[in-house]
């Protein structure tokens, strides 16, 4: 293989040591909190039939521009999952799960985007879906779960909750008419993407980051002016619930989310510390998605958080266990080291022994200079059933009887 192929594919990233530990910490914390809220962990394949994701909406950027699609050897249209929700809905329907049910998942997702800071083509998400409740209390619970995660990560004071309410279908239909009427007056001044969306999905223009679009949107009609009584009551209950939990929020009527299936409550937790990639957690209601994919009519709400973005914001130092290095001297000692290493590891002690041939004691000690404890034994120690235990931080060294070795090491590593 050519050398220039021995590298990461553009938009992907290797994870090593401390960075991987940080990722695992975030994912483990999320699953722990999910369990407190009654979520069941599930896992779906990273590949699905393409039609699973076309329900995201033919006007969404994910479907039209960003999906990794291919035909397998059987001629089936396959897609690397670009998000979790549709795959989880597929699981819900195909496994005929009983609702209400709360499902937690995590792992890599794939989108063909322009790579930049905290925006890769393969990235990782933690994902929460709640199926079976149309109550605004469910929305409050899910948002509080987000806030719980951010608080545990010590980010709650650096993140802002932005929330919007898209209303029911009656509200959306009425608002679309007036929004299109307003935007048509500025059609030629809109960005190219927004000119296309004006025809196929005008609500998505509200989410535009284009400077020319933002200027036009300043005087656009607000969806809140078109709420019917049901929408007003629902949104008020959500906001009252957040107030009751002392969760601060900002109402932002331009939040519509990038996927076509969202309705009613939509929200984002944003930060000013990641440049243009300011959304850390995002989600909302999708009461019509399950039915549109062939299931029963099922109200639902969910959200996903970007692990890379959370990782970029938090300080985390993996507490590494104290390392014990074996330095056997001579063939008999090496034979004993095999047994000793196995027995210590079975007792939960971290043993590092990589040089099975051995060199000089001086050389081995030099290589072990950054470790915690060294065990030295040769013919003399084997005959007396002892091991030299050296603390590499203090330089202290003592002979320890083999029968006392485990207790001695456990005392040192606590």
UniProtKB/Swiss-Prot annotation:
Keywords: Aminoacyl-tRNA synthetase, ATP-binding, Cytoplasm, Ligase, Nucleotide-binding, Protein biosynthesis. It comes from Ehrlichia ruminantium (strain Welgevonden). Homodimer. PANTHER family: HISTIDINE--TRNA LIGASE, MITOCHONDRIAL-RELATED (PTHR43707:SF1), HISTIDYL-TRNA SYNTHETASE (PTHR43707). One of its GO terms (biological process) is histidyl-tRNA aminoacylation. PROSITE patterns: AA_TRNA_LIGASE_II. GO terms for molecular function: ATP binding; histidine-tRNA ligase activity. GO terms for cellular component: cytoplasm. This is Histidine--tRNA ligase. The lineage of its organism: Bacteria, Pseudomonadati, Pseudomonadota, Alphaproteobacteria, Rickettsiales. It is found in: Cytoplasm. It catalyses: tRNA(His) + L-histidine + ATP = L-histidyl-tRNA(His) + AMP + diphosphate + H(+).
């Amino acid at each position: 293989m050519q050398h220039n192929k021995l590298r990461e594919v553009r938009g992907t990233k290797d994870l090593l040591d401390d960075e991987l530990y940080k990722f695992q910490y975030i994912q483990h914390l999320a699953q722990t909190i999910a369990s407190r809220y009654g979520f069941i962990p599930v896992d779906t394949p990273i590949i699905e039939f393409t039609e699973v994701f076309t329900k995201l909406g033919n006007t969404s950027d994910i479907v039209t521009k960003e999906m990794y699609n291919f035909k397998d050897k059987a001629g089936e249209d396959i897609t690397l999952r670009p998000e979790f929700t549709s795959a989880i809905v597929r699981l819900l329907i195909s496994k005929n799960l009983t609702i209400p049910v709360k499902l937690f998942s995590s792992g890599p997702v794939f989108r063909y985007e322009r790579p930049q800071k905290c925006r890769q083509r393969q990235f990782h998400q933690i994902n929460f879906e709640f199926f079976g409740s149309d109550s605004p209390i469910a929305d409050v619970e899910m948002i509080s779960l987000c806030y719980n995660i951010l608080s545990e990560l010590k980010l709650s004071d650096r993140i802002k909750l932005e929330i919007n309410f898209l209303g029911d279908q009656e509200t959306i239909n009425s608002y679309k008419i007036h929004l299109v009427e307003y935007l048509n007056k500025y059609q030629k001044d809109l960005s190219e993407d927004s000119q296309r969306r004006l025809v196929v999905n005008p609500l998505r223009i509200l989410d535009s980051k284009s400077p020319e679009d933002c200027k036009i949107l300043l005087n656009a009609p607000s969806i809140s002016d078109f709420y019917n009584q049901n929408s007003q009551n629902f949104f008020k209950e959500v906001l009252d619930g957040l107030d009751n939990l002392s969760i601060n929020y900002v109402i932002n009527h331009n939040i519509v989310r990038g996927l076509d299936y969202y309705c009613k409550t939509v929200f984002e937790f944003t930060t000013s510390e990641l440049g243009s990639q300011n959304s850390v957690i995002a989600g909302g209601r999708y009461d019509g998605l399950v039915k549109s994919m062939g299931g029963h009519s099922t109200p639902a709400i969910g959200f996903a958080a970007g692990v890379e973005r959370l990782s970029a914001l938090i300080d985390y130092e993996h507490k590494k266990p104290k390392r014990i290095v074996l330095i056997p001297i001579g063939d008999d000692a090496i034979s004993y080291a095999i047994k000793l290493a196995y027995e210590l590891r079975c007792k939960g002690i971290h043993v590092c022994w990589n040089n099975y041939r051995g060199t000089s004691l001086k050389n081995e000690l030099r290589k072990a200079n950054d470790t915690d404890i060294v065990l030295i034994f040769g013919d003399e120690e084997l005959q007396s059933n002892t091991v030299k235990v050296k603390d590499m931080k203090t330089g202290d060294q003592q002979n320890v009887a083999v029968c006392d070795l485990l207790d001695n090491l456990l005392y040192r590593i606590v």
